[in-house]
Amino acid sequence: MARVKIGEFKFGEDTFNLRYVLERDQQVRFVAKDVANSLKYTVCDKAIRVHVDNKYKSLFEQTIQNGGPTSNSVVKRGDPLYLQPHTVLITKSGVIQLIMKSKLPYAIELQEWLLEEVIPQVLCTGKYDPAIKQREEESKQLVTKLIATFTEHTNALQAVVAQKTEELVKKQEFIERIVAIKDKQIEAKDLQVTRVMTDLNRMYTGFQETMQKKDEIMQKKDAQVTDLVAKVVDLSDRAVQYPADKRKHPVLCVTRDGTTFTAITGQKTYVENQKHKRNINVANIVVENIRPNPTVDWNNATDRLQAKRSKRSIVLVRWKKRNNLKIG
């Protein structure tokens, strides 16, 4: 159950001590005499009787009968909160009537203050505390300051984010340019590798063809050598009457040094001397036989070969040496 309360209401330079009752229906009723005294009425009872409509007035005992607060059961006579049963209470409308009929120059401002600040706070908190209003103002200022600080920080953060975003975009563009350049370089390298591989394949094909031709030429030359040896052997099989002195027997000696074939003809003593003089190994001698006319046999054996020859030698390669012609 609510009790009779007293509050110190400060308006500008003036301070009002008003007693009031907050009823169950959340209606505030002020002690009419307190309001009249604060408004500087000379005869408060007359002012209340004349200026306040009856519908805005009630007695404290009526409030008690309607189930309102019972001040006398709590406080004693003489206490500021003690109210006589015939104490007149007025609603906010009655307070407004007293304010408007007063001769105060700030009556309108006082009315606005009462309606917009005092009564709403009493209804909300059960009392009026000017500090609450001040704290509200301070809170508003703090909130405003916090909002301004937050806005400033947000703007700064947005600027940093925008700058970082711009830097990232530039870095991304730089990376994309580098990647594009590298892709072109790789593409150029791939093209070069393809060209090199094509050239190598062409060279390898040409090499294979050259080696095949070489093999064919070597086979042809081997056939020529075989034919030459066969002719020399065939000539060696002919029956001829030779001198009794074996040192004077005519001899045909054919030696081979790689692709160079050299014939030594003459009496056996001469042939042996030439072999010794030229340091001819036995392994290099293709044929060495007694022939009736070694020079004629050599000429006949090499007559059909398609090669240039010296007097006693034939070389199957493409370079020329003293008394030798090399055919490839």
Swiss-Prot record:
SMART domains in alphabetical order: Bro-N
Name used for this protein in its record: Uncharacterized Bro-N domain-containing protein ORF2
PROSITE patterns from the UniProt entry: BRO_N (PS51750)
Domain of life, per lineage: Viruses
Domain Bro-N as annotated: residue spans: 3-126
InterPro entries linked: BRO_N_domain (IPR003497)
Pfam families: Bro-N
Keywords: Early protein
Other remarks in the entry: Probably expressed early and still present late in infection.
